Amino acid sequence: MSDQQNQDQGQGQGYNQYNQYGQYNQYYNQQGYQGYNGQQGAPQGYQAYQAYGQQPQGAYQGYNPQQAQGYQPYQGYNAQQQGYNAQQGGHNNNYNKNYNNKNSYNNYNKQGYQGAQGYNAQQPTGYAAPAQSSSQGMTLKDFQNQQGSTNAAKPKPKLKLASSSGIKLVGAKKPVAPKTEKTDESKEATKTTDDNEEAQSELPKIDDLKISEAEKPKTKENTPSADDTSSEKTTSAKADTSTGGANSVDALIKEQEDEVDEEVVKDMFGGKDHVSIIFMGHVDAGKSTMGGNLLYLTGSVDKRTVEKYEREAKEAGRQGWYLSWVMDTNKEERNDGKTIEVGRAYFETEKRRYTILDAPGHKMYVSEMIGGASQADIGILVISARKGEYETGFEKGGQTREHALLAKTQGVNKMIVVINKMDDPTVGWDKERYDHCVGNLTNFLKAVGYNVKEDVIFMPVSGYTGAGLKERVDPKDCPWYTGPSLLEYLDNMKTTDRHINAPFMLPIASKMKDMGTVVEGKIESGHIRKGNQTLLMPNRTSVEILTIYNETESEVDMAVCGEQVRLRIKGVEEEEISAGFVLTSPKNPVKNVTRFVAQIAIVELKSIMSAGFSCVMHIHTAIEEVTVTRLLHKLEKGSNRKSKKPPAFAKKGMKIIAVIETNEPVCVETYDDYPQLGRFTLRDQGTTIAIGKIVKILEN
């Protein structure tokens, strides 16, 4: 007996309980379909079934009118082929429901029909031969041609099983080896008819879908029903769709984060890298005047514009301030002679491109200064050598000390200290006055944490006349200084390495509405291209980069870390964004937390710090109210060894490790992973009380 017949024998077990046809099934199981066809009682048995179809019972009553063309010619049971078992599957279900009272058909619907349907799906060898020998009705070939023309308009759905989806079904059918190509004409005809019927049998039942975990193996069960098989196909098709979507997202992320050749980036900007510098210092130290003169000396502002500002300043009674008007464009700033917000300007030299950040010097605007310092690479601390002004700015609680401390906290590790106004009549390029200023500042900068020998340089300049800015100081005026000018030193100093191929990250410094939503900030890591998809944290909003503007307001296709940019974005409204939000890579989003462990150094505190102490935290461009919830350790001076017992409180000069909790989620990282997003400043009542760094992120 052939393997196909053995399989048919197992699938025909349901017919054993089909009492009226028991004798035919016995021959069928022994000899295959050929033996069954040889029984003389077969036509009579099927005629009994035909007679039943003529009775007006249930849904079966409409069977004959609908299928009259294909059904009536079947006078023999053997000639029914696919029609009885597979094509008419839907009517068999109704037939079984209404015929359950017949003893001879009671068990047919439970087992017999499933076996028959599985039998038809196999298409055994020699199955079509008996139909050709039938003496009643049309031939099988004629019927197949007729059925093919009737169902030709019905397309066959194609559902593919996605093996990569990771979804497995309980009781799923074990995969069957692919069938070999059949050459027999009658078998090909049978397959054509079966294709038309398969469209109906593959319609899924959603309620039957059972999905197990990907790690669980398939459960081996008996041969599944047609509904289970079709459900498996449908589920697999859906899984394939979702998998394809995930793959496309991964491909998009991979594409936008492809490595960028640093040589290509240099060629884009003529071989010039970009540096952000911030002018800091006490009010009236001459920061804006020095910045304006730098723009004029480098050709970023033409002579006609400067002459216009000079006339306007003279008319306003501010003749000596005209150079500062290049930076201070606000009317209030010009009238009061002091900077209120961080001014921005751009200039180029033969070697580098620069962005000037002009920070306000008044203590009322320290928050703005912190935001500017967080975007700077190099700090220029402007000190007025004029008698009275130096003492006010440094020795009597001025902003010089606080600005230097905040710059170090915000990651400005390179400091240029320019002793300004050396041409003032009260100074006259006096070396003794210069040395006095340098001596006091050196000790203070060491205490703040600067390596004075490597990271700090001092130089005498005149911001108003331009002496020492672009060209070196005239030896006639200052014979005792032979060092470089400010621009000379900036062009030749070593800058920090840029992580061009790191995950993209841009803390938002400001926002505006300009033909859409526009955000501004410095790219801290990675790079960005027009059309990239990014993630806005902490809202987790997906946004698209529509336009990129560089420092010169020019539209570009790409920007890299270290650059100050403006981005027009799509997917979020301007009012939904706040300073301190971070545009980040979807693949490596920045952490969004409310609790973390930090190392804190208290620099100025009139009272004490204990559990429950509240203050304001400045971290990158974010400002957030925080509470010190727990004091964990006290750090010993010099060794930084942790105390075994937590301290009850902390005071000025102490270093501690504590748990800090924010009122709202804030975008941060540990200092070791991303220093720019892991260091912060604590302020209370307008005073900087502590600096710190995040050592551990706690789960919310």
From Swiss-Prot:
Modified residues annotated as Phosphothreonine in this record: T355
Q: What is its main location?
A: cytoplasm
Query: For the region G5, what residue ranges are annotated?
Result: 462-464
Q: Name one Pfam family in it.
A: GTP_EFTU
Residues reported in the UniProt entry to bind GTP? 281-288, 358-362, 420-423
List the PROSITE patterns: G_TR_1 (PS00301), G_TR_2 (PS51722)
Which region ranges are annotated with the description Several sort of repeats?
10-136
Every tr-type G domain range: 272-498
Q: Which UniProt keywords apply?
A: Cytoplasm, GTP-binding, Nucleotide-binding, Phosphoprotein, Protein biosynthesis, Repeat
Where are the compositionally biased (Low complexity) regions? 114-123
Can you cite an annotated GO cellular component? cytoplasm
Q: Where is this region: Disordered?
A: 114-250
Residue spans of biased composition, Basic and acidic residues class: 179-194, 204-221
The segments labelled G1 in the record are 281-288
Specify where the region named G4 lies, as residue ranges.
420-423
Q: Where is this region: Charged?
A: 137-267
- G3, as annotated region: 358-361
User: Cellular location of this protein?
Assistant: Cytoplasm
Biological process per Gene Ontology, one example term: nuclear-transcribed mRNA catabolic process, deadenylation-dependent decay
Q: What is this protein called?
A: Eukaryotic peptide chain release factor GTP-binding subunit
UniProt lists the gene as SUP35
